[in-house]
From Swiss-Prot:
<dbReference type="GO" id="GO:0020037">
    <property type="term" value="F:heme binding"/>
</dbReference>
<dbReference type="GO" id="GO:0031838">
    <property type="term" value="C:haptoglobin-hemoglobin complex"/>
</dbReference>
<comment type="subunit">
    <text>Heterotetramer of two alpha chains and two beta chains.</text>
</comment>
<dbReference type="InterPro" id="IPR000971">
    <property type="entry name" value="Globin"/>
</dbReference>
<dbReference type="GO" id="GO:0072562">
    <property type="term" value="C:blood microparticle"/>
</dbReference>
<feature type="modified residue" description="Phosphoserine">
    <location>
        <position position="44"/>
    </location>
</feature>
<feature type="binding site" description="proximal binding residue">
    <location>
        <position position="92"/>
    </location>
    <ligand>
        <name>heme b</name>
    </ligand>
</feature>
<feature type="domain" description="Globin">
    <location>
        <begin position="2"/>
        <end position="146"/>
    </location>
</feature>
<dbReference type="InterPro" id="IPR009050">
    <property type="entry name" value="Globin-like_sf"/>
</dbReference>
<dbReference type="GO" id="GO:0019825">
    <property type="term" value="F:oxygen binding"/>
</dbReference>
<dbReference type="GO" id="GO:0005344">
    <property type="term" value="F:oxygen carrier activity"/>
</dbReference>
<feature type="modified residue" description="N6-acetyllysine">
    <location>
        <position position="59"/>
    </location>
</feature>
<dbReference type="GO" id="GO:0031721">
    <property type="term" value="F:hemoglobin alpha binding"/>
</dbReference>
<keyword id="KW-0702">S-nitrosylation</keyword>
<feature type="modified residue" description="S-nitrosocysteine">
    <location>
        <position position="93"/>
    </location>
</feature>
<comment type="function">
    <text>Involved in oxygen transport from the lung to the various peripheral tissues.</text>
</comment>
<dbReference type="GO" id="GO:0042744">
    <property type="term" value="P:hydrogen peroxide catabolic process"/>
</dbReference>
Length: 146
């Protein structure tokens, strides 16, 4: 992902304030609510029968945290996203058979959640930088599919 120095600073400064536990669970939960077909990959998570059940599901929250911890690793390695996410790409492609479009959807949901949490601090410039990052991460995760 090519970010200017200003964009990298904006992304890392905001990310330092992110509560990974809270934002991760909310982002994954919203993905499952807004795009219900993605739930098929999480059948082992138990009750996903309603938005309240999804948002309160401890397995959704735990996996959301795990996802954002991986995203944090990506932010430390913006110049090598494909390498950083190679094993996860292989897992999601070969073993889990996740539709790579879901990575793009989750990235966009994450941007919405960040905007909600940070309000005015999430300026259009910060959003533009995050859109680049989530697109880069989604492409890296989809790499094994090509």
């Amino acid at each position: 992902v090519h970010l200017t120095g200003e964009e990298k600073t904006a992304v890392t400064n905001l990310w330092a304030k992110v509560n990974v536990d809270e934002v991760g669970g909310e982002a994954l939960g919203r993905l499952l609510v807004v795009y219900p077909w993605t739930q098929r990959f999480f059948e082992s998570f138990g009750d996903l029968s309603s938005p309240d059940a999804i948002m309160g599901n401890p397995k959704v929250k735990a996996h959301g945290k795990k996802v954002l911890n991986s995203f944090s690793e990506g932010l430390k390695n913006l110049d090598n996203l494909k390498g950083t996410f190679a094993k996860l790409s292989e897992l999601h492609c070969d073993k889990l058979h996740v539709d790579p479009e879901n990575f793009r959807l989750l990235g966009n949901v994450l941007v919405c959640v960040l905007a909600h949490h940070f309000g005015k601090e999430f300026t259009p410039q910060v959003q533009a930088a995050y859109q680049k990052v989530v697109a880069g991460v989604a492409n890296a995760l989809a790499h094994k599919y090509h």
